[in-house]
Structures are given as C-alpha cells and as structure tokens.
Curated annotation (Swiss-Prot):
Belongs to the RNR ribonuclease family. This is Exosome complex exonuclease RRP44 homolog A. Residues 296-336 are annotated as: Disordered. It comes from Arabidopsis thaliana. GO terms for biological process: rRNA processing. Probable component of the RNA exosome complex. Gene3D superfamilies: 2.40.50.690, 2.40.50.700, 5'-nuclease, Nucleic acid-binding proteins.
C-alpha cells in the first residue's frame, strides 16, 4: 500500500518548503509476542502476559528505570525511537542497546510503516500531538490484535495523552503507578522527578499555587533567545565551571572575542558545567574584577582540595582565583566582561557519582526520605533526591541522575540510579573515577569478541607470500617501553649502511590487519577512542587477545607490522623515506631502564647495544634540531608509585624520571608521525586525520609572564622559538628552578587536538609545541583509535587498500575527530584522578613534612607545588572565608602576600616547609591537608 507523507521543512535560507514523501505500508510486520497466533514467532521477543507500550517522554526521562532488569516485555514504537533520536542521542543509544540485547525483552515495532498503525498527520496538528496519536493507535492495535492472550498497557506521564487514551478504550497508567504495581518499592527510587506536564500521584498539589520564594530568574523561551542572538543582545557558548571554584564559570564568546565570566550560582541560573547557554552581558559598571568575587552566600567554601599538578590551561586554576586587593591603585585588577545566563539551549546532564550528605535517619522506616546528594565533581551542585533506602546508602558511593531544576529550588532534583560500593574502598573509588570521566569499562560483547582470530595465532604462509608485505625478520628489531608493558605498539631497528649512512626503522603493530571497518570490533574501538591507564588498572580500547598477544610486538615471536623506514646521514638528515607493511621478529623487549643501562655500560659491545647507541646519537641530533626550530621542552609532574603486590596499596611515591632512552624512543616516534602526516596529506588533502596544537594567546600566557616579572625574569613569548630560548635562559639559584618554570609554562598551553584536514586551512595545521607544520598519530594503534584511522589512510595512500567510505563523509570525519578529542581528554582526566586517589591512600598512614614551592598567591594564602610528589594544593594563612582581611594583603605586581605590619611575606616560587596529612573534616570525606610549618 502506498501513502503520501506531507510535511514542512525549513531551508537554510529560512524559507518553509512543503515536502512530499511516498510511504510504502506493509502487512508483514509482526507484533513480537510469543502468545500471538497470527504472527511469525521466529522474531518474537515478548513472552509475558502483560506487555507495556512506552511513550517518548517515558523513554527520555525514565531510561534509568527501563534499564533495570525488573522492567521487561516492552514495546518501543518506531515513532518513539525517531523522536528520542532527535531529542537526546545519548538516551537513544541506550534504548537501542536495550532493544538489541538478547537477554532483555524490548521489541521495536515499526508502527510508521504498518498498514494498520500508520497515522497520517491532520491539518494544523502539531508534531507532538501527531506522535501521541500514533502511539495511541499502535497501542489500541496491540490490544485488539492480541485480544485475551496478553494485557497491553500504555505507560505515559503525559496527562492529556492518558486522558485521550482512556476515552479511546486504551488501558493506560502513569510510570509511577505501573512501578508501584510491581511490588518492588526500591524501584521507585529510580523514577525521575515529574516535570510540569507530567502526572504526579498527588495531582491535587498541582492546582495549589506555590508560596515558595523564587530563587532564580525564569529562562527565556527559545524564540526570544534566537532573536536575541541574532540582534547581538545574547551570546551563545558552552558554560565551563572553574574546577577550583564551583561558583565561577566561563562562557567563550566569539562575538566579543573573549570569555564572559559568570560569578555566583544566581548568575549561572541553574546551568550545569557543559551546558550550551545564552548569556546576557551585565552593565559595564557591574563588571567585576577578580577581587570582587564573593562566595559567602553559599554554604560551601572555595575548593581546598589537593590536586595533581595541572598539565595544561584547562586543568589549571583560573587567574581570577587571585585576589588583586593591594595597598595602591596601581595594582588594581582589570575588569572582565561579566554576565548572567538567561537560558539553556542544550543540557549536558548525565549521571553523577558521589554520596549522600551525612544526616540523621528519620523516625520510622520504610518511608520516603529526602536527601542531598554531593557529587565527587565539585563543579556540580548538590542534588535533591527521594529514597526509600536511606539507611543503606549513607556510607555508599552512588550514582544519581538529574531530572529538573525548578526556579524555586536552590538545588536541582534528581533520582537515585544505583550503588557503586563503600566509600573509601579502593575498587569503589576507582570505579567512580571511570564513571565520572565517562570511560566505558564494560566487558567486550560477544559480537566484538567474535571478530578476533582464534588463538593461538601466528604469522601464516599467506602473510609471508603477500606481495604488499615485506619480510623483515632478518633485521635486529627491538622494543623499548615502560617496565611490565604488555601492549607493545612499537619496535625499532638501526642498521649501518655501506655508504656510511644508517637505515632506521620504526615498526608499528599492524592493528588494521585485524580491525576491519564497519565490524563490531571497529565500532567498539571507535566509541572507546583510547585505552585508559590508571595506577593499578588498564581499560583497553581493544580486547586483550589483540593488545597483549596477536598485535603486541613481543620478543622472539613473529608479528605483522606497518613500518616507516628512513635512510639517514650520520648527522640525522633524512635521505629517503619509505612505508611498507612488514613481518618482523623482535629480538628483545627492553624497559627504558634496561636500554639506558646497556648504553651506559662501556663494557658492552654487542650488536643490540651498538644499535641503541647509534640510535641515541642520531636522536640527540634530531632533538636539538627540533629545539632549534622552536620546539618547546616543557615539563610536567608525572608521578609513579611502587605498589604492594599483595594488597595493591602504594608503598612509595615519587616523580617519574625521564632517561635518555625515553627521549630516544620519543624522537623516532615523533619523526614517524611527521613522515606519515606528510604522506597521507599529499594523497588525501581534504580527509586526513591530523593533530594540531594551537598557539597560546597572550591572555593564556599572562600567569606565566606575571610570575616571571615578579622574580625579575623576562620571557619572550612572541613565538615558540622565542619562548623556548627564554626558558633555556631561565636559570635560578637551585637546580629545580628551571623545571618549575617549564611546568608553569606547560599549564598555560591548551591541549593538542585531532582534526580533519578539510576543516581548516594549512596554516592552522601547525603544532606549536613541536614546531611542526604537520603532525599526526600513527605509532600507537593498539591504544589509540586515531592511529587506526591513520593506518587506513596510509595503506590507501600506498594502494594497499581502498579508502573506507567514512573518509568521503566530511561531517562524520569531524564527528570522529571530536569524539577522539573527548575520549583522549577524559582518559587523561581519569588517569590524573586515579593518581590523586592513590596519593590520598598513600598519605592516610604517612603524615610527613616536605619542601614545597609557592606557585600562586591567593588572598588568604597561597598555592604550593610539592616537587617530590607532583601535587599542589592550598596553604592558608588566615581562616577560610576571611579572604585575607586584616592581617595580610596581596602585592599583585610583586606576586607576594605580605603581613600588614611588614614583618612577614611569601613570594611566588619561594621555598616553604609544609606538613602533609590526611584529615576528615566531614564523615567519609577524607582530604589531604597542607599546613605551613
């Protein structure tokens, strides 16, 4: 049967066009119920005598409940799936996963193309009303189709939809009533709080006008926001809450060319970190400098948590954490554009990890208790939840989702999702780290594992005879990695040539020989984006049979590789470059320490040691050449732990030491990545995946320049070369001074990012930190999906494979790059959070005194960096909340905090002695406290 579907579509130019689509209606779409006598049961999923049909809002708002195994035999209509897909892609992915899970009875019914359930839109009928009518028609069809064999129930919280369903003879209930009928009270905790359009179980309350005080301004409607954006009254951007001060946020604005600062929760107006918001600038006389920020209106105080030292500008405290209150006007802080949120364009709500605020148990038991949830992420406000399990949850880490935030409520409302484990338990806190950073740590599915070759695997005769694969097993190949490394991506070789030159080879695991485009394995790797390295755990991007065996370039086994081979002169000039698929057999899997020991031991003259020394000599020349071009030699506070093999607690902690062997391997990996970038861009100028490092703005470098000026140091930041030279000249009285300056420079930089070459102009491809016009990632395909992508590009450039179709879809390529950046960032944050967790565990039983360096002056003290442990945190000179009033003042120009009588002062980069100890100011909330000695 053929039907015409008519709808209006808005063009890019803003005009409305009538669209007509032909719809073919079918009579061979089955209901999916085993009890049905007229439909083919081979595709049936629904076995219960009670089947529920859910509407769009139930799926959108109650997905946490639907994922609970107590909810089953659910019909998800195609019209519901389409609307969910348009409104919330994350929820759409979750409901699709439920529908495809063979262990769950969720059945997708294509009502939009079934001859008996197709619904033609009526004139002047809204899209929402049309969808609701389609849901009712499909539910009524199910009722009549199944008759007495199954009870069919429409579950909806839409008051009007439920009323019409009842009038039309359809059985309908609210989600709350349905859950109560199941006789499992704990499921009620999973219910999202109702919105204004929803039905509550106490409808009488809806008619009573609220007498509660309005705390927040009403959000503007989207029509007004859109008009305001066009007129330049409002500014759109992503709200980013300061990680070190949850009452201060920033919205980047292209229209005014700088960030708009949002001070205080009232001006944030119920916006969450990551929300896309519309911001209105405050009158200029209300723009504030940093010293004007007050958080006295809130119960909470400014963040005083000890953190791992930041690695880039995104992690570092904002300069506005400084007070510029001084004894003279010459040091007054400049005002910054300040604004307030007038509307939320797109929410970034997701599930959050944390615990309930300590409270006494209410009298009686079994009833509903109201509790405040405190997220581990301090950027997130407290969340109100109702729970019937309060006694069991008070000492637990739990997951909570946000449902709404009313103007009359100081805090958002949400619902309990699930427990994680006991507060303070190492496994629990590690799982919190993974959830908070959106790291997928679920086991690989059977569909993914089915893509793997059977074990044991070995190089086949077909691999050896493959004309595109060169046999390099005769070469002395070796790998150099951290100790205990099992997922070995890369190996090297260095051979002296008769003409006095060297042949250098970088051999990378040939992951794409096993991970094919469009397979479940490839889809899973693409979603995960990267492996995640925690202190005592690794979350793999690919299944372990690949990462630790089939692809890993282990010693004394033959493996498939993708090789970059250069001929180099003795002064490390590249004479020629070639790329080839290869077969190698690694002779040794060395640790950095082992490789360094070989190079340093003059008694060793074997071939492997000689090759290492030759490579190291060439690497030093290459490194110096990069530095001469302007590459930055920055520093970060990498921390390493010695772990107890029995209880897995940290035994010792210290800064990671970089050896020449580390730098040698890094140099050849960089060179391989640069060579591959040039090759793929030459052949595929519009669809290559590259990596760029944006040049830092003067504003981003301002904290470094202020610190340098305060200690009499002049830094030239006009180019990466000028900055590199300035950093080389920054030599202080102690040997750690230069490294500290480099650490401060590092945190002024943004992160490097992946991008599609067709999205930017060639000058924007530049990698600032490496001083390289072109760069990509090729050398770690076991642990980074970006490298898998680049391997496919390189293979296609050599004519080995055809370029996969994804490379012809620019928007999809951009989406892939965005996801890779998101996953890479989250992996880094998870790694840092894991280190911070183990630092806390280490100091629980080891209070200690240690030297620290002042890195930032605040109004009531200063931030110190502890070099031995790579951590930083606040040291208070006055009581928290006093903001330095009375006893101390800040000299902004000299970057020091001075006692009013002049008897004592502390300056930036000064060495101080501190005491480090874990304290517990609130139950179950331990923190590392730093105090001045």
């Amino acid at each position: 049967m053929l039907q015409s579907k008519v709808f209006n579509k808005k063009t890019r130019g803003g005009r409305i066009q009538k669209q007509v689509r032909e719809v073919y209606l079918r009579d061979d779409i089955y209901c999916g119920a085993f009890s049905c006598k007229s439909c083919d049961s081979s595709a049936a999923r629904l076995s219960s005598s009670k089947i529920i049909v859910v509407d769009t809002n139930v799926v959108l708002h109650q997905i946490d409940l639907l994922e609970n195994k107590a909810i089953d035999t659910v019909v998800v209509l195609s019209v519901v799936l389409d609307e969910v897909k348009n409104r919330n892609r994350s929820v759409y992915n979750r409901i699709r996963l439920l529908c495809s899970n063979p262990a769950r009875q969720f059945y997708v019914f294509s009502n939009h193309v079934h001859k008996d359930t197709y619904v033609q839109a009526m004139e002047k009928e809204s899209a929402n009303d049309h969808n609701d009518r389609a849901i009712r028609v499909a539910t009524l069809w199910y009722q009549k189709h199944l008759g007495d064999t199954s009870q069919v129930l429409l579950v909806t919280n839409d008051r009007e939809n439920k009323r019409k369903a009842t009038e039309e003879g359809i059985s309908a209930e609210t989600i709350e009533a349905y859950v109560k009928s199941l006789g499992q009270p704990e499921l009620l905790d999973l219910l999202a709080q109702p919105t204004n359009e929803d039905i509550t179980m106490e409808d009488a309350d809806d008619s009573r006008p609220s007498k509660r005080k309005l705390i927040y301004q009403e959000h503007k409607p989207m029509s007004e926001i859109t008009a305001g954006l066009h007129r330049g009254i409002y500014h759109q951007g992503k709200l980013r809450v300061n990680r070190f001060n949850p009452y201060e946020a920033y919205v980047g604005s292209e229209s005014i060319g700088e960030e708009i600062i949002i001070y205080g929760r009232s001006n944030m107006n119920r916006a969450f970190d990551g929300d896309i918001v519309a911001v209105e600038l405050l009158p200029r006389d209300q723009w504030q400098d940093e010293k004007a920020l007050s958080i006295a209106e809130e119960d909470d105080e400014e963040d005083d948590t000890v953190h791992l030292a930041p690695d880039n500008v995104d992690d570092a405290p904002r300069t506005s954490n400084l007070s510029h209150e001084t004894s003279g006007d010459k040091n007054a802080a400049p005002v910054r554009p300040s604004g307030r949120v007038v509307g939320v364009i797109r929410r970034n709500w997701h599930s959050y990890c944390g615990s309930l605020e300590p409270m006494s148990l209410p009298a009686g038991s079994g009833g509903t208790a109201h509790a405040l949830f405190v997220s581990k992420d301090r950027r997130i406000p407290k969340i109100r939840i109702n729970t019937r399990q309060l006694q069991n949850l008070l000492d637990m880490r739990i997951v909570v989702a946000v449902d709404s935030w009313d103007r009359q409520s100081r805090y958002p409302s949400g619902h309990y999702v699930r427990p994680i484990g006991k507060i303070g338990d190492k496994e629990t806190e590690t799982e919190v780290v993974l959830i908070e950073n959106d790291v997928d740590y679920s086991p690989f599915s059977s569909q993914v594992l089915a893509c793997l070759p059977p074990l044991p695997w070995s190089v086949s005769s077909e691999d050896v005879s493959n004309p595109v694969r060169q046999d390099l097993r005769h070469l002395l190949v070796f790998s150099v990695d951290p100790p205990g490394c099992k997922d070995i991506d890369d190996a090297l070789h260095c051979t002296s040539l008769p003409n006095g030159n060297f042949e250098l080879g970088v051999h990378i695991a040939d992951v794409t020989n096993f991970v094919h485009p469009g397979t479940p394995l490839d889809d899973e790797a693409s979603k995960r984006g990267t492996s995640v390295y925690l202190v005592e755990r690794r979350i793999d991007m690919l299944p372990k049979p690949l990462t630790e065996d089939i692809c890993s370039l282990r010693a004394d086994v033959e493996r498939l590789a993708f090789s970059v081979i250069w001929e180099m002169s003795p002064d490390a000039e590249i004479i020629s470059t070639r790329f080839t698929k290869s077969i190698i057999k690694s002779s040794a899997a060395l640790s950095y320490i082992e490789a360094q020991a070989r190079m340093d031991d003059s008694r060793l003259t074997d071939s492997l040691t000689t090759d290492l020394r030759n490579m190291n000599t060439l690497a030093k020349i290459m490194r110096q050449r990069r530095i001469d071009r302007g590459a930055l030699t920055l520093a970060s506070a990498e921390v390493k732990f010695d772990i107890d093999p029995e209880n897995h607690d940290p035994l010792n902690i210290g800064m990671y030491q970089i050896l020449e062997a580390n730098q040698m391997v890094e140099e050849f990996m960089l060179a391989a990545n640069v060579s591959v970038a040039g090759q793929i861009l030459k052949l595929f100028p519009s669809c290559s995946l590259l990596r760029r490092h944006p040049t830092p703005t003067r504003e981003m470098l301002e904290p470094l320049l202020r610190t340098a000026a305060a200690i009499g140091l002049t830094l030239d930041v006009s180019s990466s070369k000028a900055l590199a030279d300035s950093l080389d000249r920054a030599v202080g009285e102690d040997p750690y001074f230069n490294k500290l300056i480099r650490i401060l420079a590092t945190r002024c930089m943004t992160q490097a990012v992946y991008f599609c070459s067709g999205d930017l102009s060639p000058p924007e491809y530049h990698h600032y930190g490496l001083a390289a016009p072109l760069y990509t990632h090729f050398t770690s395909p076991i642990r980074r999906y970006a490298d898998v992508f680049v391997h496919r590009l390189l293979a296609a450039s050599l004519g080995i494979y055809k370029l996969p179709t994804v490379f012809q879809d620019r928007p999809q390529l951009t989406s892939v790059a965005d996801n890779l950046n998101y996953r890479h960032r989250n992996a880094q944050m998870a790694g840092r959070a894991s280190v911070e967790l183990y630092v806390l565990i280490y100091f629980r039983t080891r209070p200690t005194d240690e030297e620290a360096r002042v890195v930032k002056i605040r109004s009531n003290g200063f931030i110190v960096f502890v070099p031995k442990y790579g951590i930083e945190g606040p040291v208070y000179l006055t009581g928290k909340g006093e903001k330095g009033a009375g006893d101390w003042y800040v000299d902004e120009e000299k970057q020091k905090i001075v006692k009013m009588d002049g008897s004592l002062s502390y300056s930036v980069l000064q060495t101080v002695k501190i005491h480090m100890e874990v304290v517990e100011p609130q139950p179950n909330r331990p923190k590392l406290q730093l105090t001045l000695l």
